[in-house]
């Protein structure tokens, strides 16, 4: 039973979610998957290497871990193998790793335009949305392969807003990474930070623990579209 007041955003506003660390608290599993995969390649993964991965696309991560000399096919092979390992590790864990309150929040706002905008691999996006049962609520999904420029470039959020048919300034973006916040701000969106990955995110309107936050509910009550 729901024990919190689920906030509903005002008509005329749209909601854009990142995926990892916003809908699913999956970044710890990504960390473990990279450690295991890199070890198989003879690479020991330190904390600085793991910190680099947050908010990044796989091609960036693979180049950082394995070097810029790799051919595109080899980069894709490393990325695909790691993500297959990640999905294997996440199997049966998705429901337990949903960020608290996110299911109720998405369902309560089903009448609003909702999009997902993520640097994540397409296979991971579909896996997580289908496994969580949330896919039907998203009118638009923009993954890391649909944009030329990954976060922190604003392209992914600009494309999501355009496909939803709303102004970027009338979107509320939920993010957990520094690069994601930079991208959303550059797009002109209103940004809420989730403390799942980083305790303090600069440049957000507010940072909250999860979607049950009373502070989030109060802030959303004051958000109106620029034009009615």
Where would I find each of the regions flagged by the language model?
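Asp-based, Mg2+/Mn2+-dependent phosphohydrolase catalytic module
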Residues: 1-13, 103, 107, 121-228
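Active-site neighborhood of HAD-like aspartate-dependent phosphohydrolases
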Residues: 2-51
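Short, acidic loop-to-helix structural element flanking the phosphoryl-transfer center
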Residues: 4, 88-116, 122, 126
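Conserved SAM-binding loop
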Residues: 23, 98, 114-117, 149, ...
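An amphipathic alpha-helix signature
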Residues: 31, 35, 47, 51, ...
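Helix-loop "lid/cap" segments that line or gate small-molecule binding pockets
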Residues: 37-38, 57-71, 128, 161
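Anion (oxyanion) recognition and catalysis
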Residues: 39, 110, 185
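Metal-dependent phosphoesterase signature
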Residues: 44, 64-104
